[in-house]
């Protein structure tokens, strides 16, 4: 793979997670929120955020985690809303855990595992974010320090939790915001318009689904990681988003 350029757009202090330190100690958790799973992910804890088979959050704690609330990042895997696995971001989980950050890897409905459309994937992403905020204290996470990240279509989902307010699971409590504190986006799909990615699948609702069509001035800070050889998540689109 040839990567000629890595471009970072708008890095703010909230994204420099390593500045947040956690005191050493033991993590003691006992709750009926947690479930067993035969998935091959090496998560410390698994949560269920909705009633679908894919409605699971895989939680990875720092070895120095305490019962005090820590910052957290929820990651959404890529795969064109067609397929993929939360395992995609296990290496990022391992890295961020070293800095006292709790990492949550979200599963969600895709065309392959549920026969669904990109709209259901976004509904699930927002449900996952709301669930994480609602239950943050139970898993020793600071609800005001939850970031969202993802790659490709997962980057779209992360961005859309912040920008796209019209698409929601009707079962969600909309009084709970899905907006993260900040965004960590790897080659994200942010333009789903007529000249963007996936328009043929979302054309009937793209104005509510496409992050670049919904960005507001008060949007949370974001960092973009892009490669100039990427022909799907095109760099100039992200420059437009930054502007």
Question: Where does each model-flagged region fall?
Answer:
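Conserved small/polar residues in nucleotide/adenosyl-binding loops
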Residues: 237-243
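Short beta-strand element of the alpha/beta-hydrolase
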Residues: 69-78
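N-terminal cap/lid segment of alpha/beta-hydrolase-fold proteins
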Residues: 32-66
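Mobile cap/lid helix-loop segments that gate and shape the active-site cleft of serine hydrolases
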Residues: 180-214, 220
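Alpha/beta-hydrolase active-site loop
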Residues: 117-136
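Short beta-strand/loop motif that positions the catalytic acidic residue
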Residues: 224-226
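Short amphipathic alpha-helix adjacent to the substrate-entry channel of hydrolases
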Residues: 87-104
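Primarily recognizes the serine-hydrolase "nucleophile elbow" in alpha/beta-hydrolase
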Residues: 130-196
